[in-house]
Amino acid sequence: MRIGHGFDVHRFGGEGPLIIGGVRIAHPQGLLAHSDGDVALHAATDALLGAAALGDIGKLFPDTDPAYKGADSRALLREAYRSIRARGYRLGNLDITLIAQAPKMAPHIPQMRVFLAEDLQCPIDDVNVKATTTEKLGFTGRGEGIACAAVALLIKE
């Protein structure tokens, strides 16, 4: 078994869309990023890559490569997971923590879990998503952006 940790942060800016965990969420701004700015999937991808000792999302999908401009983070997650599967690993479980003052994530978490289970070809019970605030402290508390942490367990087959 191998454990990986991922973390990502993006600040709000532009008109959007705001995509978190593959779900489009109504919000006046999107997140500024080279790709679609999906902090949940970026943190999850980093956790998976870290567990497999394959570097990080920036190594696999460099933000200097125009091919990834505006990229769908679900596609990036699927591609990263294919590389992990090719090394003989499968997901044990994935746990994601979103950190944001707004928008409220709870209504969107069930669909995020569905997308993650689809993309990682696993039972929905192997993926968890939860959200918290920083009680209006720091950049997330001031509504300047969203942060996300993820932990993944991989099992050698």
From Swiss-Prot:
4-CDP-2-C-methyl-D-erythritol 2-phosphate binds at residues 8-10, 34-35, 56-58, 61-65, 100-106, 132-135, 139, 142. A divalent metal cation binds at D8, H10, H42. Keywords: Isoprene biosynthesis, Lyase, Metal-binding. Its cofactor is a divalent metal cation. It is an enzyme of class 4 (lyase). Involved in the biosynthesis of isopentenyl diphosphate (IPP) and dimethylallyl diphosphate (DMAPP), two major building blocks of isoprenoid compounds. Catalyzes the conversion of 4-diphosphocytidyl-2-C-methyl-D-erythritol 2-phosphate (CDP-ME2P) to 2-C-methyl-D-erythritol 2,4-cyclodiphosphate (ME-CPP) with a corresponding release of cytidine 5-monophosphate (CMP). This is 2-C-methyl-D-erythritol 2,4-cyclodiphosphate synthase. The gene is ispF.
